C-alpha cells in the first residue's frame, strides 16, 4: 500500500470523526439546556419534554455514528487501495 494513501486515510478518518462530532455535540448541549429550561418553566410537561428530548438526542447521535462508520471504512476497508 502506498504510504501517502495510508497517511491520508488516517488523517481523513480523524477528520471524519472530529467533524461529525462537533455539530451533534453542540446540538445536544443546546437541546438539553432548552429541555431543562422548559421543565423548569412547566414541571407538569416534564414527561413529554423528556421523551421528545431523548428521541432528538438519538437522532443527533446517529450523525456521529455515521462519521464513525466512515472513519472505520477508511481505516479497515479502504476504497482507495
From Swiss-Prot:
The record marks 61 as: Reversibly protonated during proton transport. GO terms for cellular component: chloroplast thylakoid membrane; proton-transporting ATP synthase complex; proton-transporting two-sector ATPase complex, proton-transporting domain. Pfam families: ATP-synt_C. The chain crosses the membrane at residues 7-27, 57-77. GO terms for biological process: proton motive force-driven ATP synthesis. GO terms for molecular function: lipid binding; proton-transporting ATP synthase activity, rotational mechanism. InterPro entries: ATP_synth_csu_bac/chlpt (IPR005953), ATP_synth_F0_csu (IPR000454), ATP_synth_F0_csu_DDCD_BS (IPR020537), ATP_synth_F0_csu_sf (IPR038662), ATPase_proteolipid_c-like_dom (IPR002379), F/V-ATP_Csub_sf (IPR035921). It is a multi-pass membrane protein. Its main location: plastid. Keywords: ATP synthesis, CF(0), Chloroplast, Hydrogen ion transport, Ion transport, Lipid-binding, Membrane, Plastid, Thylakoid, Transmembrane, Transmembrane helix, Transport. It is found in: Plastid, Chloroplast thylakoid membrane. It comes from the Eukaryota. In plastids the F-type ATPase is also known as CF(1)CF(0). F(1)F(0) ATP synthase produces ATP from ADP in the presence of a proton or sodium gradient. F-type ATPases consist of two structural domains, F(1) containing the extramembraneous catalytic core and F(0) containing the membrane proton channel, linked together by a central stalk and a peripheral stalk. During catalysis, ATP synthesis in the catalytic domain of F(1) is coupled via a rotary mechanism of the central stalk subunits to proton translocation. NCBIfam families: ATP_synt_c (TIGR01260), PRK07354.1 (NF005608). F-type ATPases have 2 components, F(1) - the catalytic core - and F(0) - the membrane proton channel. F(1) has five subunits: alpha(3), beta(3), gamma(1), delta(1), epsilon(1). F(0) has four main subunits: a(1), b(1), b'(1) and c(10-14). The alpha and beta chains form an alternating ring which encloses part of the gamma chain. F(1) is attached to F(0) by a central stalk formed by the gamma and epsilon chains, while a peripheral stalk is formed by the delta, b and b' chains. Belongs to the ATPase C chain family. HAMAP family: ATP_synth_c_bact. This is ATP synthase subunit c, chloroplastic. It comes from Solanum tuberosum (Potato). The gene is atpH.
Amino acid at each position: 500500500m502506498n504510504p501517502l494513501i495510508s497517511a491520508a486515510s488516517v488523517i481523513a478518518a480523524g477528520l471524519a470523526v472530529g467533524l461529525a462530532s462537533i455539530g451533534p455535540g453542540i446540538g445536544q448541549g443546546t437541546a438539553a439546556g432548552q429541555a431543562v429550561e422548559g421543565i423548569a418553566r412547566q414541571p407538569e410537561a416534564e414527561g413529554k419534554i423528556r421523551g421528545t428530548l431523548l428521541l432528538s438526542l438519538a437522532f443527533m447521535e446517529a450523525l456521529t455514528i455515521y462519521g464513525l462508520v466512515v472513519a472505520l471504512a477508511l481505516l479497515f476497508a479502504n476504497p482507495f487501495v
